[in-house]
A protein has these predicted regions:
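Class I S-adenosyl-L-methionine-dependent methyltransferase catalytic core
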Residues: 2-173
Length: 173
């Protein structure tokens, strides 16, 4: 007989946290919680996003992590500026605190920010690019909830498009 942890489904990186939290097991995350809220996004998310959206050839991946999304974007011919708060070994990453430092970038932003700072990432991203450029973030659906987020973000910057993944399929609304 196996322990429950041994039979729990895992995502593409071997982390069972995403499946456990999807099932509502909030306490399950205690043993697999990543420092600095780092959870890598499967690079196939870029493939699916690019089926529906076009982007400027210059992309800023401001929470690059180990470079999974950046590498996939580069494979499509994008020029990718890579920054992160933590050096996770991805070549060419500039160490930047995206939450507190202000930059201007003439391109689009595609990233998977740490959930606990998603509001700050959204606001700073929108402030960092020219009007009319795009910000695409891989976020939990809960990011759309809450009076405070509505007042600070969505009442001023309503999302243009929201894509929802269900069982690894992309649903376009």
């Amino acid at each position: 007989m196996s322990k429950k942890e041994d039979v729990m489904p895992k995502d593409w990186t071997g982390n069972s946290h995403s499946f456990a939290s999807m099932l509502g097991a909030r306490n399950y995350a205690k043993n697999e919680r990543e420092q600095h809220d780092f959870y890598a996004t499967d690079p196939r998310a870029i493939d699916d996003l690019l089926k529906y959206e076009t982007f400027n050839k210059n992309i800023w991946e401001c929470a690059v992590g180990q470079g999974h999304l950046a590498e996939r974007l580069k494979s499509y011919g994008y020029t990718v500026e890579c920054t992160d708060l933590i050096d996770r070994g991805y070549p060419g990453t500039e160490i930047v605190d995206f939450v507190t430092e202000k930059y201007y970038f003439d391109g689009d932003i595609i990233t998977n920010p740490p959930y606990k700072y998603c509001s700050e990432f959204i606001l700073n991203a929108l402030d960092s690019i020219p009007t009319g450029n795009k910000v695409a973030m891989f976020l939990k659906l809960q990011t759309l909830e809450g009076q405070k987020r509505y007042e600070e973000i969505y009442s001023k910057y309503p999302p243009k498009t929201i894509y929802i993944y269900i069982l690894r399929e992309l649903v376009v609304l």
